């Protein structure tokens, strides 16, 4: 990324928080994307902002990119609110768009997996499938909680662990800098 303004950093960070929130969700089996969508939108909603697209859609194999029945959206759509099942891949892509200004969208793919089973039922979770570092130069930690920073640090650690074995030494040095742990 090139230089970013303070305002762009504020929104970049809010959208990033939404991406991290949704990717870290733990939820009971039976939930749909409508139940979880607020996790991605909440940082923007707290600012009185929103984005006018679904937060995510099902992703098939063989490049069948928009494949249902799974999705994340804030609005109930008849026939379009499937229960999130183990093995479903869904995009996690909140955004923010300023007319005559700038746009931001972070996009990860997340895999739905079974988590622990308790007397309350089967819990589910997501696993990230996308491993690309977020640009620290565009992030303003003043708009993040300690929990947000910890989530981002865990994500960046996973990026380094998954990607670095395939890189040259110079590329590893670059990736190490982009994924190094930061403090609030």
Descriptions of predicted regions:
Residues 1-184:
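Active-site neighborhoods and metal-handling regions in enzymes and metal-associated proteins
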């Amino acid at each position: 990324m090139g230089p970013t303004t303070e305002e762009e950093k504020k929104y970049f960070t809010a959208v990033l928080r939404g991406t991290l929130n949704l990717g870290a969700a733990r939820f009971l089996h039976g939930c749909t994307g409508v139940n979880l969508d607020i996790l991605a939108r909440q940082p923007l909603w707290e600012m009185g902002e929103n984005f006018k697209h679904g937060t995510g859609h099902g992703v098939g194999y063989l490049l069948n990119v928009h494949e249902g029945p799974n999705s994340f959206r804030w609005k109930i759509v008849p026939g379009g609110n499937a229960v999130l099942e183990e093995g479903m891949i869904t995009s996690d892509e909140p955004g923010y768009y300023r007319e005559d200004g700038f746009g931001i969208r972070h996009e990860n793919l997340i895999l739905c997996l079974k988590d622990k089973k308790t007397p309350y039922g089967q819990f589910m979770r997501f696993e990230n499938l996308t491993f690309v570092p977020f640009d620290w130069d565009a992030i303003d930690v003043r708009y993040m909680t300690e929990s947000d920073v910890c989530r981002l640090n865990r994500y960046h650690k996973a990026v380094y662990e998954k990607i670095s074995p395939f890189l040259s030494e110079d590329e590893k040095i670059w990736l190490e800098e982009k994924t190094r742990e930061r403090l609030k």
